A protein has these predicted regions:
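S-adenosyl-L-methionine/SAH cofactor-binding core of RNA-modifying enzymes
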Residues: 48
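Short secondary-structure boundary segments
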Residues: 66-67
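Iron-sulfur (Fe-S) cluster-binding modules
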Residues: 1-41, 51, 56-61, 70-139
């Protein structure tokens, strides 16, 4: 990891089998590839992998993307006493959880645009330790 990446917030996403989960994962990957955040592995945090738990505890601001109201990302983080600086629950953006279906790429782009706009309007700081609720935006 370069010093530039180390200065970025971490992003964790749901990556389950539903369309909503895969949309959340897609948005996290796009944030990572665009250099907005560095994606890390929520399964490793939930699975108590020491190096990944240390990364989550590094003090970097955390963006959590949950695909549905089960809030698995938030739950995995809270098991380790970690609270995301920004938590996006994608159902609030009109994302529907569908099994055995792919996500809608156009909807994924809209969600990505909304998350990026929120992060640009309300940048995360290095010392941000509490969750700021994500504003509701039109789907």
């Amino acid at each position: 990891m370069t010093d530039t990446r180390a200065a970025l917030p971490l992003v964790y996403s749901c990556s389950g089998c539903s369309s909503a989960a895969q949309l959340a994962n897609h948005v996290a990957l796009r944030l990572d590839r665009a250099g907005v955040a560095e994606m890390s592995c929520i399964a490793g945090v939930g699975g108590d992998v020491p190096s990944l738990v240390r990364t989550a505890h590094s003090g970097r601001p955390i963006i959590a993307l949950d695909g549905c109201p089960l809030n698995c990302v938030q739950g995995c983080l809270s098991r380790h006493g970690i609270q995301a600086a920004r938590h996006y629950q994608l159902q609030q953006y009109g994302v529907k959880k569908r099994r055995h279906e792919d996500f809608d790429p156009a909807q994924a782009q809209l969600v990505l645009d909304q998350v990026q706009a929120d992060l640009a309007a309300h940048p995360l700081t290095a010392h941000e330790a509490t969750a700021a609720p994500a504003p509701r935006m039109a789907a």
